[in-house]
């Protein structure tokens, strides 16, 4: 051990005559006398039967505990919550999704700090688990390793691979009479074969990859199938590794530096990852005290190409990426090209460059990950837009398949449900820009994901014919010409609030502008006439969240400026 106390926190709970009552309680949960001399490691499990993403994590928590106990520590498993974006999508319940990120962070911080654990293994599955866990680990700043619960295997129907987004898009296809009820039911029944997180480069897999690039999970952790021996071993190794980090005195904020976040952004771009990564990385950096801004995504995005042909915009699933080696070969390619900071420390106790020294190349002939000289897109698909509709920024996901600009006629909706109805009943036509507002962090509240409307657009065959902009968010499964995270949001008086049906809007990825074709004077007149709507909630967690949450451009966090 170092010259630091080997049990800096648990010793305050269990050492000495006066702590006998605490020891008595712990005897009841399985502590032997000898265990009180061991470092206590909390295993933060997100297990629940709420969602397939997390239904197996109780077993993974036991695997991690075995690693801790075998390494000379004492593991204590506890639970935090999860919700399912995929199940609640398109409902009022989706307003709680981003809120759950904060609840997860707060609850892990609460348990670990209250119980005096010396280190943490956090295991996450569904989308908000990952940033929620990392925010907590950053706040606590105790030796920690994050473990991703793993990706789901693809479903299959009529020889075609399926995932949850296939079902969302089938709803639009059914509404457009392109398939019948029997086909919709067949897709529904075969899309989700078992445990694991949604299978494309959607938000869960994006954030798991970002966290591996950040250095907070063991090499390979992000690209493993949920039910596999590799994932069991990943958990065991994580449990053992936390004890080594305790010995080294290496803490999360030593790892999660500005350069480490730049590495995470680089890998997210190369993989074609979710727009949610922007929001979550900003929030995670905030918890670390790292000054990360939207402009950093633009700066890095100008030099990093999109290389991965992964769903939702591409052809392949995460499970197929696992088969060719995961993200380690990609990271080695990026490092060799000077696009990653190799000197960043990681939870292995080694630098990123040291971790990647023996990383293999992808097998010859694979077409899932392109070479740097043959990218899918020469720069980032995550485009930060500004302009008179988004003075403080917005996030677009533009792979180039949709084109690089879109000008159309505004069709304005004050909630997601109204927009979805208009899409499904045929009101939305070629050339429209669907505007969904009052769905931001404060106005929703909760910044719902718009997967139902965007999937309906795709299912109706309008993916290249219409655009959608919102102060809400998008699922990692969204593709098409979409812009989210518009800031300031409509509820706080952002220009989105004064857009009218029939206005002309331009989205331009090359000039990085989101523009309302109305004069500044007219915008001023409309804003002067605008009044803020009454809050949708005045009691409960959504009311609290709306009062506390920061803008999307700052990560939508709830502990700033207190």
From Swiss-Prot:
Pfam family, one: ILV_EDD_C
PROSITE patterns (alphabetical): ILVD_EDD_1, ILVD_EDD_2
Chain sites annotated for binding [2Fe-2S] cluster: 53, 126, 198
Enzymatic reactions: (2R)-2,3-dihydroxy-3-methylbutanoate = 3-methyl-2-oxobutanoate + H2O; (2R,3R)-2,3-dihydroxy-3-methylpentanoate = (S)-3-methyl-2-oxopentanoate + H2O
Binding locations of Mg(2+): 85, 127-128, 449
Pathways involved: Amino-acid biosynthesis; L-isoleucine biosynthesis; L-isoleucine from 2-oxobutanoate: step 3/4; Amino-acid biosynthesis; L-valine biosynthesis; L-valine from pyruvate: step 3/4
N6-carboxylysine: residues bearing it: 128
Cofactor: [2Fe-2S] cluster; Mg(2+)
MF terms (GO), sorted A to Z: 2 iron, 2 sulfur cluster binding; dihydroxy-acid dehydratase activity; magnesium ion binding
Active-site residues (renumbered): 475 (proton acceptor)
Note describing how the cofactor binds: Binds 1 [2Fe-2S] cluster per subunit. This cluster acts as a Lewis acid cofactor.
SUPFAM superfamilies (UniProt xref): IlvD/EDD N-terminal domain-like (SSF143975), LeuD/IlvD-like (SSF52016)
UniProt xrefs under InterPro entries: DHAD_IlvD/Edd, Dihydro-acid_dehy_C, DihydroxyA_deHydtase, DiOHA_6PGluconate_deHydtase_CS, ILV_EDD_C, ILV_EDD_N, IlvD/EDD_N
UniProt keyword list: 2Fe-2S, Amino-acid biosynthesis, Branched-chain amino acid biosynthesis, Iron, Iron-sulfur, Lyase, Magnesium, Metal-binding
Source organism superkingdom: Bacteria
Record function comment: Functions in the biosynthesis of branched-chain amino acids. Catalyzes the dehydration of (2R,3R)-2,3-dihydroxy-3-methylpentanoate (2,3-dihydroxy-3-methylvalerate) into 2-oxo-3-methylpentanoate (2-oxo-3-methylvalerate) and of (2R)-2,3-dihydroxy-3-methylbutanoate (2,3-dihydroxyisovalerate) into 2-oxo-3-methylbutanoate (2-oxoisovalerate), the penultimate precursor to L-isoleucine and L-valine, respectively.
Family assignment from sequence similarity: Belongs to the IlvD/Edd family.
Assembly information from the UniProt record: Homodimer.
Protein name in the entry: Dihydroxy-acid dehydratase
Lineage: Bacteria, Pseudomonadati, Pseudomonadota, Gammaproteobacteria, Methylococcales
Gene name as annotated: ilvD
């Amino acid at each position: 051990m170092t010259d630091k106390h080997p049990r800096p926190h648990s010793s305050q709970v269990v050492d000495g005559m006066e702590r006998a009552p605490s020891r008595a309680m712990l005897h009841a949960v399985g502590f032997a006398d000898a265990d009180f001399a061991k470092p206590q490691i909390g295993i933060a499990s997100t297990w629940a039967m709420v969602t397939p993403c997390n239904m197996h994590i109780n077993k993974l928590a036991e695997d991690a505990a075995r690693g801790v106990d075998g390494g000379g520590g004492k593991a204590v498993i506890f639970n935090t919550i999860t919700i399912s974006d995929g199940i609640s999508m398109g409902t009022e319940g989706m307003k709680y999704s981003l809120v759950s990120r904060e609840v997860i962070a707060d609850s892990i911080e609460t348990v670990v700090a209250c119980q005096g654990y010396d280190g943490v293994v956090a295991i996450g599955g569904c989308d908000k688990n990952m940033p929620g866990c990392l925010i907590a680990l950053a706040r606590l700043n105790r030796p920690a390793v994050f473990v991703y619960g793993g990706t789901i295997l693809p479903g299959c129907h009529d020889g075609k691979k399926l995932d949850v987004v296939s079902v969302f898009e089938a709803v639009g296809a059914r509404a457009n009479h392109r398939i019948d009820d029997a086909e919709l039911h067949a897709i529904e029944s075969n899309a989700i074969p078992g445990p694991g997180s949604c299978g494309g480069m959607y938000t869960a897999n994006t954030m798991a990859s970002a966290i591996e690039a950040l250095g907070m999970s063991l090499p390979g952790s992000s690209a493993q199938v949920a039910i596999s021996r590799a994932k069991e071993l990943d958990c065991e190794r994580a449990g053992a590794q936390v004890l080594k980090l305790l010995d080294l005195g290496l803490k999360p904020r030593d790892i999660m530096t500005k350069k480490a976040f730049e590495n995470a952004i680089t890998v997210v771009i190369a993989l074609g990852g979710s727009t949610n990564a922007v929001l979550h990385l900003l929030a995670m950096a905030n918890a670390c005290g790292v000054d990360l801004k939207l402009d950093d995504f633009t700066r890095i995005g100008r030099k990093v190409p999109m290389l991965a042909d992964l769903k939702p915009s591409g052809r392949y699933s995460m499970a197929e990426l696992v088969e060719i080696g995961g993200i380690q070969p990609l990271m080695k390619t990026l490092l060799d090209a000077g696009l990653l900071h190799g000197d960043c420390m990681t939870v292995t106790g080694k630098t990123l460059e040291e971790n990647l020294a023996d990383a293999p190349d992808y097998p010859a002939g694979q077409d899932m990950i392109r070479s740097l000289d043959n990218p899918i897109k020469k720069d980032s698909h995550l485009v930060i837009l500004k302009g008179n509709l988004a003075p403080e920024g917005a996030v677009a996901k533009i792979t180039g398949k949709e084109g690089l600009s879109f000008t159309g006629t505004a069709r304005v909706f004050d909630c997601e449900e109204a927009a979805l109805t208009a899409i499904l009943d045929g009101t939305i036509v070629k050339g429209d820009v669907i505007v969904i507002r009052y769905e931001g962090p404060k106005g929703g509240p909760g910044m719902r994901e718009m997967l139902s409307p965007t999937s309906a657009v795709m299912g109706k065959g309008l993916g290249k014919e219409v655009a959608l902009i919102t102060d809400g968010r998008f699922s990692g499964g969204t593709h098409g010409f979409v812009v989210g995270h518009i800031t300031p949001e409509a509820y706080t008086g952002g220009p989105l609030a004064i857009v009218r049906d029939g206005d002309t809007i331009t989205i331009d990825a090359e000039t990085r502008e989101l523009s309302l074709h109305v004069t500044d004077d007219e915008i001023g007149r409309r804003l002067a006439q605008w009044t803020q709507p009454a809050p949708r909630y005045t009691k409960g967690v959504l009311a609290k969240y709306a009062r506390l949450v920061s803008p999307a451009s700052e990560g939508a966090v709830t502990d700033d400026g207190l």
